[in-house]
Amino acid sequence: MKENIGDCTIDLTVTSPPYDDLRNYNGYSFNFEETAQELYRVTKEGGVVVWVVGDKTHKGSETGSSFRQALYFKELGFNLHDTMIYEKDSISFPDKNRYYQIFEYMFIFSKGKPKTINLLADRKNKWYNGKKHIKGHYRKMDGEKVRHHKQNLLKEFGVRFNIWRIPNGHQKSTLDKIAFQHPAIFPEKLAEDHILSWSNEGDIVFDPFMGSGTTAKMAALNNRKYIGTEISKEYCDIANERLKNYIILHKRMEGKGYRLPQVHS
């Protein structure tokens, strides 16, 4: 990262780092503090880092690594803009003495005030009735009762809550079969929704743990530029092959009148 990415160049980072040795990533590990410091260096003022992470349970206790990492990001100068929850629709085999574990944290860090906020408004309001006006009364200062109509301010769809339930697992995280050669699939929907929320077209999206290339793919699909780094050559090859297949497919579509995103790596 130090050699290839300049200071204050990244608009948005969306990533899910390896955590607590829950999976074997070909024997590789990472230095968290060094990674966090580099993310602060390369992030633009107003840029955002989406850090998706969880904790493992060891000897009856959760490690708490996620909280320690969040506090370290704050020590570096990041704001903790939001603590969101990624709720999975599939679960791992449960322990006998605790409730089913179905979520991970999505920490939203910003370097100063976020410069881009596009809140997704796709939550159906259950009280919406379609009426344009609501009848009512109010009293003047002298006590006189006056009948009036006021505009119905309740919209059909509202901004979603900060707990996102996103399908994950086989044929849910992605339909790209090659991606499942990676041990931990990052759901495309999760990456896409954060990209839409915290960046605009033409912005640079970064993933320092690119894995199978999900963040890069969704950035390209949504007309963002992308940068990805990956220490494992095997996973880097998977990501490149996946993105190559995507580019070939959509070049064919381009000839049929589809407008394609410009892909940068």
UniProtKB/Swiss-Prot annotation:
UniProt-listed Enzyme Commission number(s): 2.1.1.113
GO terms classed as biological process: DNA restriction-modification system; methylation
Any one Gene Ontology cellular component term annotated for this protein: cytoplasm
Enzyme type, top EC level: transferase
Keyword Methyltransferase: yes
InterPro entries listed in its UniProt record: DNA_methylase_N4/N6, MeTrfase_CN4_CS, RM_Methyltransferase, SAM-dependent_MTases_sf
Keywords from the named record: DNA-binding, Methyltransferase, Restriction system, S-adenosyl-L-methionine, Transferase
Entry annotated with the keyword Magnesium: no
Reactions that this protein is recorded to catalyse: a 2'-deoxycytidine in DNA + S-adenosyl-L-methionine = an N(4)-methyl-2'-deoxycytidine in DNA + S-adenosyl-L-homocysteine + H(+)
A family per Pfam: N6_N4_Mtase
Family the entry assigns: Belongs to the N(4)/N(6)-methyltransferase family. N(4) subfamily.
Note from the entry: This methylase is encoded on the proviral phage H2.
Function: A beta subtype methylase, recognizes the double-stranded sequence 5'-GGATCC-3', methylates C-? on both strands. No endonuclease has been identified for this methylase, although it is speculated it might protect against BamHI.
Record protein name field: Orphan methyltransferase M.BamHII
Record organism: Bacillus amyloliquefaciens (Bacillus velezensis)
